Curated annotation (Swiss-Prot):
Catalytic activity, as annotated: oxaloacetate = enol-oxaloacetate; oxaloacetate + H(+) = pyruvate + CO2; a 3-acylpyruvate + H2O = a carboxylate + pyruvate + H(+); acetylpyruvate + H2O = acetate + pyruvate + H(+)
UniProt xrefs under NCBIfam families: PRK10691.1
Protein name as annotated: Oxaloacetate tautomerase FAHD1, mitochondrial
Biological processes per GO annotation: oxaloacetate metabolic process; pyruvate metabolic process
Cofactor annotation remark: Requires a divalent metal cation for activity.
Residue numbers bearing the Phosphoserine modification: S37
Keywords: Acetylation, Cytoplasm, Hydrolase, Isomerase, Lyase, Magnesium, Manganese, Metal-binding, Mitochondrion, Phosphoprotein, Transit peptide
Function: Tautomerase that converts enol-oxaloacetate, a strong inhibitor of succinate dehydrogenase, to the physiological keto form of oxaloacetate. It is thereby required to maximize aerobic respiration efficiency by preventing succinate dehydrogenase inhibition. Also acts as a weak oxaloacetate decarboxylase (ODx), catalyzing the decarboxylation of oxaloacetate (OAA) to pyruvate and CO(2), and as such is likely a regulatory enzyme in the TCA cycle. Also displays acylpyruvase activity, being able to hydrolyze acetylpyruvate and fumarylpyruvate in vitro.
Chief location of this protein within or outside the cell: mitochondrion
Length: 221
């Protein structure tokens, strides 16, 4: 049965935001981390969504907010233990996404062996572009992502540099978390992550596909 929910408004009804960390070797190196044999996963709540036109809110407890530009994959149907060979059949489209990160908080969490929830899952920590139908991106592993802050290029990278491919990620995640229509998977960020502050303007894009702008504001809480 076809869904009556519009994927063009996925941020209004999608349930899960599953994020993949350490999926670009150059970013792993800049973070002084280690490439692992399996994807690093963490979650964001649906209240993390910030569609274009809304601000990126810097939590009151954060003093070092970082940008991470990523390709997001939108699921078009329910999937459980999806075979890697069939994984792309579950993709409805894509979105450009930011994984906003309270880096100072994340560093403390790492030192204490704690989850990254406070650093990664706050309100508006997942700004997203308009929905891009699957047909507009024939090869999601042949894209150039970029991000600017106040007009200065900070991040750029090619999705061909992913350590784990999109089909592998979908299959891997679906064996742990049952995926639903409208769920979003963030596929990792290339090198160049860095700090933003209140009143900064973030602009990001996928060459020839989509772009978006957000302004950073300080949250009251």
């Amino acid at each position: 049965m076809a869904s009556t929910k519009p994927l063009s408004r996925f941020w209004e009804w999608g349930k899960n935001i599953v994020c993949v960390g350490r999926n670009y070797a150059d970013h792993v190196k800049e973070m002084r981390s280690t490439v692992l044999s399996e994807p690093v996963l963490f979650l964001k709540p649906s209240t993390a969504y910030a569609p274009e036109g809304s601000p990126v809110l810097m939590p009151a407890y954060c003093r070092n907010l970082h940008h991470e530009v990523e390709l997001g994959v939108l699921l078009g149907r329910r999937g459980e233990a999806v075979p890697e060979a069939a994984a792309m059949d579950y993709v409805a489209g894509y979105a450009l996404c930011l994984d906003m990160t309270a880096r100072d908080v994340q560093d403390e969490c790492k030192k204490k062996g704690l989850p990254w929830t406070l650093a990664k899952s706050f309100t508006s920590s997942c700004p997203v572009s308009a929905f891009v139908p699957k047909e507009k991106i024939p090869d999601p592993h042949a894209l150039r992502l970029w991000l600017k802050v106040n007009g200065e290029l900070r991040q750029e990278g090619k999705t061909s540099s992913m350590i784990f491919s999109i089909p592998y990620i979908i299959s891997y995640v679906s064996k742990i978390i049952t995926l639903e229509e409208g769920d979003l998977i963030l596929t990792g960020t290339p090198k160049g992550v860095g700090a933003v502050k209140e009143n900064d303007e973030i602009e990001a894009g996928i060459d020839g596909v989509v772009s978006m702008r957000f302004k950073v504001e300080r949250s009251k809480y």
